[in-house]
């Protein structure tokens, strides 16, 4: 398109709304956020220059060839008539209109059409009417054509030779979302700048550079309206336009303001993250800068807390300030203000040293007068990693001058820490360090002044054998008179003042010490490289650092002059003054026992108590002087801080008067502690303590319960002990008012022995302080011991006993004696004591064989009470032994190292202390005794039964599924045990080995598939799958025939079920052995096709689904086709839309990708769509998938015996496979106790109703003659085993009535008082559902009855006694039971036998064989559930006759007679049933769920969007370790039990569509992670949203002569952890769903066929039992069928080949299945996967599929 000549009119029109363009981007690196006025001018200049330089000819275009850019259209092309285009394109300037022409009379008049403003539109000629604006000076919107001869001059640029060009401007993109508006504005502003309109863009202050004209405003409005549709504008933009829809300038101004604000925030964050400070600027300025940035960010809503701010500041510190990183990095609560205080202090100290530093520049003549001598004349011997670097130093040595005065100079630490310095740092002179510079390579210069000292540094000397220092400021543990002679290189003596330790604290936060000599008679402080090498520190002159042998950098080395120096800032200062010189020679003192070791040895007692004990010889073997007390004052034991944390101290000295009034052992204090929960049955849950008032001697005894007889046994024992051992009689025992002390049994015992019980008074908390404080102290010690040792919690009483032994031997600060001394006993010999939990090896005197190891790892607990041995805990044997045959395990690790409070190991100290007890290894030194290994006298410690709680500490690795090494061959157990202080696994069952720990995050149940090649044989594939486990030799022969077998699959299965795409058929595991599947001839195939009974050889078309059946056995009486149609006809299968035969759905459309993440399972497999591939050619060993925990003594190693976890939290492994069933679910407690219902009930009306119910229950008990009222028995005359506690419980029934029940405490009933073989039977839910279904089909009347106080009609055979009810006022008496009281173990069985006998003998009923509590006669069927009876009969009079007979013997109430033909509502065993005879029956629980679900504290959303499915595919449960506090864990487990308990109750009643989710979540009850809880909440929410759903049954057609019982089966292969499969079955009677089951397969299946066979085999037994029940209740013939969507399963069942199967588990199930099918006249048919309603039992389904499969039978 040719450009026309422009006239000299002041206005130039343009044919496009986006007029001036350049093909060259302007400032591509320009920040789009920066839109200030200065930048806008730059854009204008750049755009002008670009436009002036670009020329095109009329026949060419400057637009680059780009398919995404629209090219100018010729004039002949008509304009498009469609709307605006969102595509980006290049715009071209059109032919100019006459000068001064403007279509608009006013900017507010916008007569344009949308398509004309489209970026894709280019008008053909000058007649086109477009918005235009006048061109002015400084805004070159266009350029004149060459024909005009005129030149348009721009005042803002010097270019006057502009030629005719065609300019193209890239328009802004279309705005598509309000959230994208900020980014869109940036591109829009850039578009205006490229269009030479930068001057009208508002600046930061909101004003443009120049005024905008009306035409420019119109152009602005039009372009903004086109590219920013109103529906995508933010709210604040719409608010501006609502006031003035043309005020685009205000929108741009506010947008620029927002961009500037965002830019400032980003700059502040970048500045804060890149802070740098080295002291070169004042600290005040640095603080002001940082605080201003933080304040601005906080004001803008970006909160920077103290921790983050301090980390950013410290990261930027360098030079002398860098040291703050290592002193402040542990302060968790440090503030910015505190950090700046340190920075100011260093800065002021630095400035002060600079101002006060004298001039050290030497006169050159001083060098000539220097007559100092050197310590040696050899070259420095430097220990370096690069030996060649050593030669770089000159032949100068460190000098120790024998001068009378020391040349002490002020020292400063100015070196910088550099880990990668490659050249030695050299300084001109020592003054360079005081010029405010860092000691870096930038300050390094070479100098000839090599003999000057570098202040504040130590000279590294390879020739010096000892380290010498002039100042005593850094000497630790200094001692005078060292008796050491030191000479210099000239053999002259150097007097030594003292010897001590020089302690270093290097930059890696490690501490090291070496010996140092103090003398003021040397010129330099010398650091011996030889002594550094002795502590594993070398000088590396390649890197110029001090480092360890492993390469850890400790400190930099500075080269100053000709020598190498290290800074003194790594020295730890000491306040100990060094004595004056004394040359008297004394030998070095012997090594003392470190205080931390003694502190741990003596049960973590405090230093004062230990010193008193050593002074008074209550602890023997060594004296007070043998302990190093230097660290005792400031020493903090982290184990004590954790274990003994307390609120405040108790009042001391409050009981001195009692100590003066009584003799020893006459006044005792006692108290009981407990219970301790979550312990095995063999471990005690309580302990009772006794303390003598005078001597403070303590005793502790374990208790398993607080029964009266247990307490009495302890009192008898301690009184006899005191009487026989101390010849004393106890006069007074002080105790609290607990029931264990106030009971009559103990009171009489004390009265009989002449002992006065002294009880505490009300609100007197101090009166019982002695016993309470002792229990608290022992408990503190217990926690500390368990924390320090890492032993499991079930050994808690051993820690209590160890602490008691030690504390009886420690002196009291007041009495100056120990309790043992007061009692006249000898002091405790500490050489016989071991630290609690000390690892030892115990000799096995009776091994299993001669080659069995003789040593058993164990842990020392405490000295034995009954021998001279020691109680040792043996984790591998789960028991404790009393033995002297042990040796202490040596090593270098310490439990204390994780707290970094001491780097010492105490092996040598422990060896010296217990030297006399280390001799059992040398058998020739001692004589072995036959009784050295004695079982402990404590029953609770022997044969410990570990609690099945989750372990506190877990092993970190699990077996990879691709690991070819069996778990038993792991080499962890082959490591030599040689570590001391090795931690025992906290709460870890010693049976758990590292190889059988369950699921790991890395473990995958999906095998990796490689080299998949299609064979072209109907979807068969060849897979190369890595082995999951080594295959035994016996399997080789079987696998050799793998290639001959086939797995026939149906090709058109529905999306998420088994297809030949999801489960790739493979030759070994996907199908059967070739000898098992019969060969089918062509004739047989043809015959089957003719009879429309397709075989598994050919897949029938999907639209012929009604004939997709394979009958297994054809009875002679019914044709095959009729049987098929009869069974499938009435089933509630989904109606599928018809499909065209020519349309083939994409089989991969809805399949999720196969990846390892699916194996972690959502809800244990939710999200699986059977997209798992079977294993090729070699089978996986079933032993590798066992989830049972096996005993393994070889798992004792150094790894799993350490526990570094804090005591407040536990890590729990996801042991999903350990949960066998939902049996552990605790029901929700709906009953109230007496105090809840009556005593403390604030609801007066409810309280009155409960009182009325209470009296009604008492009257009923008396009426039923429940107990013998003729005689009352004294409690002491009756065997306590036969005494049963009782209580009242209250509840509100569903009908609103209030009920009270007097029950016995059967949970604590002694086993000798009942026959464990008796069974309490109730009607099975399947029997009830079967009876209801038959009642609907046969128009039966349903009558509901209730027998009041049913159990009280049954006599009791055993001799049992109970305490009378409280209202009788006979607490000291017992009454004998005559009737079966509710709560007793035998009451249910007694009632069952009673009512069974009555129904059979008096009512003429008989019990159906195999179905307890189902009785029938010729007219009536009865279902019995405890005291509820459901009667079914076609004649209502027959029911009434039974009722009349029952009323003769029992108090029978008619709940619902069931007469009438209208809809009748029942509440039968929790089911809300609506029944209209001969029409329908609806089963639901809407009222019950509406009442119960809100009480679960689940955040329900009653008005929100309802969930349409209980779960969705693709959700996976993480199986990472769960770290959670113990209390929170118990709370969440209890919450899960409540939620899953209620869901399980509802699911098994009638919501069979939820059973898969319920079963899977039930496996995670002991793993209550946030994800599991959320999924559980989602399930409860779905139950709430669908609480009105009902199980719908319709009456069967009366023309049907037979009853049809069908089981539909399905399996989801390998979608559970550890290759387990989920199986499900749904049972239907006459087309009505009566039950369902979803569970995890007990065996690990290796193919989909095995899983399907497992599912069918699980359904057959129950199908046969139901068949027997139906035939007993209804005499019609019955047809039994089993439907499955697995053709290979049908083929195996049909086959008569009895060759050996692939494995015995698979073969056994298949053979049993064949026998059951053939022997029970059972039909097996194929059902399309799309119609298989059992799919909902095995996997989560999409919403559409879920509704399709369930809406026919539950809605």
Curated annotation (Swiss-Prot):
Its EC number is 3.4.23.-, 2.7.7.49, 2.7.7.7, 3.1.26.4. A motif (Bipartite nuclear localization signal) lies at residues 1178-1212. The keyword Plastid does not apply. Residues 1-93, 126-173, 352-421, 956-1087, 1092-1111, 1130-1187 are annotated as: Disordered. Residues 1610-1752 form the RNase H Ty1/copia-type domain. It comes from the Eukaryota. The record marks 401-402, 582-583, 1217-1218 as: Cleavage. The C-terminal RNA-binding region of CA is sufficient for all its nucleocapsid-like chaperone activities. Integrase core domain contains the D-x(n)-D-x(35)-E motif, named for the phylogenetically conserved glutamic acid and aspartic acid residues and the invariant 35 amino acid spacing between the second and third acidic residues. Each acidic residue of the D,D(35)E motif is independently essential for the 3'-processing and strand transfer activities of purified integrase protein. This is Transposon Ty1-DR1 Gag-Pol polyprotein. The lineage of its organism: Eukaryota, Fungi, Dikarya, Ascomycota, Saccharomycotina.
């Amino acid at each position: 398109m040719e450009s026309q000549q422009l006239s000299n009119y002041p206005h130039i029109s343009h044919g496009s709304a986006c007029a001036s363009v350049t093909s060259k981007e302007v400032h591509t690196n320009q920040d789009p956020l920066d839109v200030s006025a200065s930048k806008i001018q730059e854009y204008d200049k750049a755009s002008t220059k670009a436009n002036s330089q670009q020329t095109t000819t009329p026949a060419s275009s400057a637009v680059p060839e780009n398919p995404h850019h629209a090219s100018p259209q010729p004039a002949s092309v008509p304009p498009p008539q469609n709307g605006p285009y969102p595509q980006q394109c290049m715009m071209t300037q059109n032919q100019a209109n006459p000068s001064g022409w403007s279509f608009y009379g006013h900017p507010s008049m916008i007569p344009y059409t949308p398509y004309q403003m489209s970026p894709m539109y280019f008008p053909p000629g000058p007649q086109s009417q477009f918005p235009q604006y006048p061109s002015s000076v400084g805004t070159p919107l266009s350029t004149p054509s060459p024909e005009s001869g005129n030149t348009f001059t721009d005042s803002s640029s010097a270019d006057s030779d502009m030629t005719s060009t065609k300019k193209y401007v890239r328009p802004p993109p279309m705005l598509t979302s309000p959230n994208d508006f900020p980014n869109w504005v940036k591109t829009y502003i850039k578009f205006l700048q490229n269009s030479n309109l930068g001057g009208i863009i508002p600046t930061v202050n909101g004003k443009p550079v120049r005024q905008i004209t009306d035409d420019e405003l119109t152009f602005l409005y039009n372009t903004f309206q086109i590219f920013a549709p109103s529906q995508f504008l933010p709210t604040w933009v719409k608010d501006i336009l609502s006031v003035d829809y043309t005020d685009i300038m205000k929108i741009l101004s506010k947008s620029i303001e927002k961009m500037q604000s965002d830019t400032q925030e980003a700059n502040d964050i970048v500045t804060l993250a890149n802070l740098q400070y080295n002291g070169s600027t004042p600290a005040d300025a640095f603080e002001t800068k940082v605080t201003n940035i933080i304040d601005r960010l906080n004001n803008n809503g970006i909160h920077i807390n103290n921790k983050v701010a301090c980390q950013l500041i410290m990261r930027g510190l360098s030079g002398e300030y860098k040291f703050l990183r290592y002193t402040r990095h542990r302060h968790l609560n440090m503030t910015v203000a505190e950090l700046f205080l340190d920075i100011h202090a260093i800065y002021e100290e630095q400035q002060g040293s600079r101002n006060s530093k004298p001039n050290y520049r030497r006169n050159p003549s001083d060098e000539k007068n220097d007559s100092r001598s050197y310590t040696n004349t050899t070259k420095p011997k430097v220990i370096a990693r690069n030996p060649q670097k050593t030669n770089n130093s000159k032949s100068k040595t460190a000098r120790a001058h024998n001068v009378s005065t020391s040349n002490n100079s002020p020292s400063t630490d100015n070196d910088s820490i550099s880990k990668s310095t490659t050249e030695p740092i050299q300084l001109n002179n020592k003054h360079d360090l005081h010029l405010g510079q860092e000691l870096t390579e930038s300050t390094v210069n070479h100098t000839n002044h090599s003999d000057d000292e570098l202040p504040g540094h130590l000279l590294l000397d390879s020739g010096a054998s000892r380290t010498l220092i002039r100042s005593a400021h850094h000497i630790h543990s200094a001692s005078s008179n060292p008796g050491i002679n030191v000479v210099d290189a000239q053999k002259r003596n150097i007097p030594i003042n003292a010897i001590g330790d020089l302690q270093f604290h290097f930059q890696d936060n490690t501490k090291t010490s070496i010996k140092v000599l103090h003398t003021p008679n040397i010129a330099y402080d010398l650091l011996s490289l030889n002594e550094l090498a002795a502590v594993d520190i070398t000088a590396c002159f390649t890197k110029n650092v001090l480092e360890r042998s492993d390469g850890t950098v400790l400190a930099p080395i500075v080269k100053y002059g000709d020598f190498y120096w290290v800074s003194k800032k790594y020295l730890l200062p000491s306040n100990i003054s060094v004595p004056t010189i004394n040359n008297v020679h004394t030998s070095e003192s012997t090594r003392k026992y470190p205080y931390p070791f003694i502190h741990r040895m003596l049960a973590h007692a405090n230093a004062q108590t230990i010193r008193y004990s050593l002074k008074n010889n209550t602890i023997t073997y060594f004296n007070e002087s043998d302990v190093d007390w230097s660290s005792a004052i400031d020493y903090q034991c982290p184990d004590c801080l954790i274990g003994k944390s307390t609120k405040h101290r108790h009042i001391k000295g409050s009981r001195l008067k009692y100590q003066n009034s009584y003799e020893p052992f006459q006044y005792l204090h006692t108290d009981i502690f407990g219970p301790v929960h979550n312990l095995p049955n063999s471990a005690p849950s309580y302990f009772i303590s006794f303390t003598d008032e005078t001597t403070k001697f303590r005793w502790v005894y374990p208790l398993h319960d607080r029964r009266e007889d247990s307490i009495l046994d302890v009192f008898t024992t301690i009184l006899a002990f005191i009487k026989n051992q101390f010849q004393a009689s106890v006069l007074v025992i002080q105790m609290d008012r607990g029931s264990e002390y106030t009971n009559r049994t103990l009171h009489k015992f004390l009265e009989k022995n002449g002992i006065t019980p002294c009880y505490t008074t009300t609100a007197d908390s101090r009166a019982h302080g002695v016993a309470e404080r002792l229990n608290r102290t022992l408990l503190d010690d217990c926690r500390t011991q368990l924390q320090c040792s890492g032993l499991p919690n079930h050994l808690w009483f051993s820690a209590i006993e160890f602490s008691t032994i030690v504390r009886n031997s420690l002196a009291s600060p007041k009495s100056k004696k120990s309790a043992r001394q007061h009692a006249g006993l000898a002091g405790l010999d500490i050489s016989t004591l071991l630290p609690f939990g000390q690892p030892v090896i115990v000799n096995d005197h009776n091994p299993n064989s001669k080659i069995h190891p003789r040593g058993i790892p164990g842990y020392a607990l405490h000295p034995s009470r009954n021998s001279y041995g020691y109680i040792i805990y043996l984790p591998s044997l789960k028991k404790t032994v009393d033995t002297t045959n042990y040796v202490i395990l040596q090593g270098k690790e310490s439990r204390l190292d994780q707290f970094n409070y001491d780097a010492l190991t105490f092996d040598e100290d422990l060896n010296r202390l217990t030297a006399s007890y280390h001799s059992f290894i040398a058998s020739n030194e001692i004589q072995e005794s036959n009784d050295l290994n004695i079982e402990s006298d404590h029953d609770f410690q022997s044969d410990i039964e570990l609690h099945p709680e989750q372990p506190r500490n877990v092993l970190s690795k699990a077996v990879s599924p691709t690991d070819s090494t069996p778990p038993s061959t792991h080499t962890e157990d082959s490591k030599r045990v040689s570590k001391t202080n090795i931690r025992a696994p906290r709460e870890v069952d010693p049976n758990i080995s590292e190889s059988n720990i369950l699921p790991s995050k890395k473990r995958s149940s999906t095998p990796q598939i490689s080299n998949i090649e299609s064979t072209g044989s109907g979807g068969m594939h060849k897979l190369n799958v890595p082995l999951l486990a080594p295959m035994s030799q016996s399997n080789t022969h079987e696998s050799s025939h793998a290639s001959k077998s086939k797995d026939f699959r149906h090709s058109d299965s529905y999306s998420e079920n088994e297809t030949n795409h999801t489960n790739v058929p493979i030759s070994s595991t996907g199908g059967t052995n070739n000898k098992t599947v019969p060969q089918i001839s062509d004739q047989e195939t043809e015959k089957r096709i003719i009879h429309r009974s397709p075989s598994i050889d050919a897949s029938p078309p999907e639209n012929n689904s009604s004939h997709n059946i394979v009958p297994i056995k054809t009875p002679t009486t019914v044709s095959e086709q009729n049987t098929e149609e009869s069974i499938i006809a009435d089933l509630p299968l989904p109606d599928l839309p018809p499909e065209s035969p020519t349309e083939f759905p994409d089989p991969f459309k809805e399949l999720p990708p196969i990846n390892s993440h699916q194996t972690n399972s959502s809800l244990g497999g939710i999200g699986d769509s059977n997209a798992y591939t079977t294993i090729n050619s070699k089978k996986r060993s079933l032993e590798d998938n066992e989830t049972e925990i096996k005993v393994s003594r070889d798992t004792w190693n150094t790894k799993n015996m350490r526990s570094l976890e804090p005591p407040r939290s536990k890590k729990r492994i996801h042991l999903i496979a350990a949960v066998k069933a939902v049996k552990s679910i605790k029901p929700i407690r709906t009953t109230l106790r007496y105090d809840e219902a009556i005593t403390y009930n604030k609801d007066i009306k409810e309280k009155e109703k409960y009182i009325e119910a209470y009296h009604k229950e008492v009257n009923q008990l008396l009426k039923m003659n429940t107990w013998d009222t003729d005689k009352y028995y004294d409690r002491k005359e009756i065997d306590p085993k036969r005494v049963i506690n009782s209580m009242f419980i209250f509840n509100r029934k569903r009908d609103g009535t209030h009920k009270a029940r007097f029950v016995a405490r059967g949970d604590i009933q002694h086993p000798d008082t009942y026959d464990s073989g008796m069974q309490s039977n109730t009607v099975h839910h399947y029997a009830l559902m079967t009876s209801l279904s038959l009642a609907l089909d046969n128009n039966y009347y349903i009558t509901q009855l209730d027998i009041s106080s049913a159990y009280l009609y049954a006599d009791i055979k055993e001799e049992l006694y109970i305490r009378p009810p409280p209202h009788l006022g006979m607490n000291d008496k017992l009454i004998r039971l005559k009737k079966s009281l509710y709560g007793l173990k035998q009451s249910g069985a007694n009632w069952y036998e009673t009512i069974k006998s009555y129904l059979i003998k008096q009512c003429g009923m008989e019990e159906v064989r195999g179905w307890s509590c189902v009785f029938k006669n010729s007219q009536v069927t009865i279902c019995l559930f405890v005291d509820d009876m459901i009667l079914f009969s076609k004649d209502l009079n027959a029911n009434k006759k039974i009722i009349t007979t029952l009323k003769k013997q029992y108090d029978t109430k008619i709940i619902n007679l069931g007469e009438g033909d209208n809809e009748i509502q029942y509440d039968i065993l929790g089911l809300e049933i609506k029944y209209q005879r001969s029409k329908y029956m609806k089963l639901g629980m809407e009222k019950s769920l509406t009442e119960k679900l809100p009480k679960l504290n689940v955040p329900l959303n009653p008005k929100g969007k309802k969930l349409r499915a209980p779960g969705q595919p693709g959700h996976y449960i993480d199986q990472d370790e769960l770290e959670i506090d113990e209390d929170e864990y118990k709370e969440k487990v209890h919450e899960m039990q409540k939620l899953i308990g209620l869901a399980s109750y509802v699911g098994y009643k009638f919501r069979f569509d939820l059973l898969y989710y319920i079963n899977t979540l039930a496996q995670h009850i002991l793993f209550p992670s946030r994800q599991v809880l959320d999924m559980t909440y989602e399930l409860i929410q779905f139950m709430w949203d669908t609480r009105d759903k009902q199980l719908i049954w319709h009456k069967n057609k009366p023309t049907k002569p037979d009853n049809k019982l069908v089981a539909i089966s399905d399996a989801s292969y390998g979608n559970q952890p550890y290759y387990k499969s989920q199986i499900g079955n749904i049972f239907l009677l006459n087309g009505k769903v009566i039950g369902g089951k979803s569970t995890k397969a007990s065996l690990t299946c290796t193919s989909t066929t095995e899983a399907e066979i497992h599912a069918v085999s699980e359904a057959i037994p129950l199908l046969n039992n139901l068949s027997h029940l139906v035939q007993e209740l209804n005499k019609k013939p019955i047809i039994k069928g089993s439907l499955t969507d697995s053709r290979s399963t049908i083929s195996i069942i049909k086959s008569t080949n009895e060759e050996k199967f692939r494995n015995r588990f698979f073969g056994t199930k298949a053979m049993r299945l064949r026998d059951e099918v053939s022997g029970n006249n059972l039909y097996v048919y194929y059902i399309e996967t799309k119609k298989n309603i059992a799919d909902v039992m095995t996997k989560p389904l999409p919403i559409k599929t879920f509704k399709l499969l369930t809406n026919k039978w539950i809605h």
